Design a protein with these regions (language model features):
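Small-residue (G/S/T/A) turn/hinge positions that recur once per unit in extracellular repeat modules
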Residues: 110, 119-121
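Catalytic-histidine neighborhood of serine endopeptidases
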Residues: 124
Length: 236
C-alpha cells in the first residue's frame, strides 16, 4: 500500500513539474515560442524537463516550422539534448531578443537560423558552481560509489571532457567555424561574449538567406554597384 501511494505521489509530482515547464512554451500559428525569462517560472532556465516539452509540442503540432528562443541559458547537457530533438524536426530557429549560454546549443539546431535586428547571441564556456557540485556529490555519492571528493573530481573531469566534445560536435554539425568554437570556450562563465552580426554570419552561426526569402527585391540605386545575391539574415 505504501509503495502504491509513493507511486501515485511520484506521478503527481512529475505531472505538476511537466505542467510547470510547459509554461515556458506558447504556440502562435507555425511558431513555437520558448521563453525561460517569464516571471514566476518554477525553473527559469534551460532544464532537462524542457526536453520532454519540446518533443511533445513538436510531435503534437506538425505545422510548426519555426522555434523562437528567448533564454539566458541553463543546463549545458539539457541544451545539447534539445539540439538533438530539434534536429529531427527540420525546423528553423529564431532569436528576437537574446539566446545565450546553453540556449546557443538549441539555436544551432535550426535548419535556417534567424537573428532579428538588435537581438543577441551570447557565448561562454559551461560551468558548474561549487554549491551545485556539493549537492550533487551528497545526493549521488552512494549510487555512484564515490568514496571521497577525489573520486568525484575524477568523474567531473571525465564529464567535462564529454560535454566539451559534444559541444564541438554540435557546432561542427551546424557548420560553425572551429575558430569561433574555440573562442567561445575561452570565455569565463562569469562573462558573456556577444559577437557582432558579421562575426556570427562569417562563422556560420547565423544563416545567410536569399533576399527574396526575407523581402521583395528592390530596384538597385545607381551607385555603380551590383545588386547582392545574399544579405545577412535579418528579420524586421
Amino acid at each position: 500500500m505504501k509503495t502504491f501511494l509513493l507511486f501515485l505521489l511520484l506521478i503527481t509530482f512529475n505531472a505538476n513539474l511537466t505542467h510547470a515547464e510547459d509554461a515556458k512554451f506558447t504556440i502562435e500559428e507555425d511558431t513555437l515560442y520558448y521563453n525561460t525569462e517569464k516571471k514566476d517560472l518554477k525553473s527559469g532556465y534551460v532544464s532537462y524537463s524542457d526536453i520532454y516539452s519540446f518533443r511533445k509540442f513538436l510531435n503534437e503540432n506538425p505545422n510548426i516550422s519555426k522555434v523562437n528562443l528567448n533564454s539566458s541559458g541553463g543546463s549545458a547537457g539539457a541544451g545539447l539534448e534539445i539540439f538533438r530533438v530539434l534536429s529531427d524536426f527540420n525546423v528553423d530557429t529564431v532569436v528576437s531578443n537574446e539566446c545565450s549560454s546553453a540556449c546557443i546549443n538549441i539555436f544551432l539546431a535550426g535548419n535556417v537560423r534567424w537573428l532579428h535586428l538588435g537581438a543577441l547571441l551570447g557565448f561562454h564556456r559551461p560551468d558548474w558552481d561549487a554549491v551545485s557540485m556539493q549537492e550533487y556529490f551528497n545526493n549521488y555519492k552512494e549510487e555512484e560509489k564515490w568514496s571521497d571528493t577525489f573520486e568525484f573530481s575524477n568523474w567531473i573531469q571525465k564529464d567535462t571532457i564529454l560535454i566539451t566534445s559534444k559541444i564541438f560536435k554540435n557546432y561542427t554539425d551546424a557548420g560553425v567555424n572551429v575558430s569561433l568554437t574555440v573562442d567561445t570556450l575561452k570565455i569565463d562563465n562569469d562573462d558573456m561574449w556577444y559577437p557582432s552580426r558579421q562575426e556570427l554570419t562569417s562563422a556560420g552561426v547565423v544563416s545567410l538567406i536569399p533576399i527574396a526569402v526575407n523581402k521583395p527585391q528592390l530596384r538597385p540605386m545607381n551607385l555603380g554597384l551590383s545588386s547582392p545575391e545574399l544579405k545577412l539574415s535579418m528579420m524586421e
